[in-house]
């Protein structure tokens, strides 16, 4: 099976959802809210989830969906529900044929709430299951930095398709990723990338558009002949990865370049196209289990670009255990040629 149709629908669904998330940012988040006000994220999360699940339901009605949000909050908060509906109801791709493929406009606010609730699958080892993160990188979203709309298809626990929209990443693969990438990008000119992969068929990127799908080009991780020259990509939030341990791993490997800090699965996408080399997400809490929607699409995109993705013990990520990566601890992603060396350094630092 080729999975080309699944990839096509996933890309269009993600693309349409990013039209909403950018609208929410510009109307609700930009310069008007304190960082403690989560309502723009809430609105974007629920709205993007509704739009993407609608597209999956229209094209693959029997597939299951694992998503983060449930509509019970909205059924209790009528004002919030009405505001989300106001923003969602007119969102469409400018290309009519592409938009119809996704099911067109949602018919009503009630239909929107019902469809949000279709993301409650428990996951597991059998069947076709979509893992959806409507806004990955909530703090990045609020500060106008990096966030991603992420969708992956699992079949019998194996990731077959991944699509990630990064509205604030530069389209140019060769663009220098500096520390400023994490703030105030505001989907400026030259920003907005859609990454995707099919298992066994490589990874591609294309510019995000508001209409039909743009032309793609294949992407791959860059060779790292000297590990000391490698560049780390890591999270901005200290609560998501143990940054002191990350620094110790870098030191052990002789890496002196400053780490690039960015939110969301944009980290997976950045190393997949050679704008960085190593992504570490080292455990902060002993009992924390990573959510499958935070990793499914990025895991495949990196592997299909010539990388390897494992946990801190060197085990591949197991997406068959339900809604979390219950069998894994942490994440280490790097080019295949240096993965063992990175894992070895991680084990030394974490005393595994």
UniProtKB/Swiss-Prot annotation:
Keywords: Hydrolase, Magnesium, Metal-binding, Stress response. Induction: Down-regulated when grown with elevated levels of potassium chloride. Mg(2+) 1 binds at residues 68, 133, 135. Mg(2+) 2 binds at residues 133, 136, 294. GO terms for biological process: phosphatidylinositol phosphate biosynthetic process; sulfate assimilation. CDD domains: PAP_phosphatase. AMP binds at residues 240, 264, 267, 281, 294. This is 3'(2'),5'-bisphosphate nucleotidase. It is an enzyme of class 3 (hydrolase). Binds 3 Mg(2+) ions per subunit. Its EC number is 3.1.3.7. Belongs to the inositol monophosphatase superfamily. Adenosine 3',5'-bisphosphate binds at residues 138, 240, 264, 267, 281, 294. Pfam families: Inositol_P. NCBIfam families: bisphos_HAL2. GO terms for molecular function: 3'(2'),5'-bisphosphate nucleotidase activity; metal ion binding. It catalyses: 3'-phosphoadenylyl sulfate + H2O = adenosine 5'-phosphosulfate + phosphate; adenosine 3',5'-bisphosphate + H2O = AMP + phosphate; adenosine 2',5'-bisphosphate + H2O = AMP + phosphate. It comes from the Eukaryota. It comes from Emericella nidulans (strain FGSC A4 / ATCC 38163 / CBS 112.46 / NRRL 194 / M139). Phosphatase that converts adenosine 3'-phosphate 5'-phosphosulfate (PAPS) to adenosine 5'-phosphosulfate (APS) and 3'(2')-phosphoadenosine 5'-phosphate (PAP) to AMP. May regulate the flux of sulfur in the sulfur-activation pathway by converting PAPS to APS. Involved in osmoadaptation. Transmembrane segments: none annotated. Mg(2+) 3 binds at residue 68. The active site is at 45 (proton acceptor), 138 (proton acceptor). Its cofactor is Mg(2+).
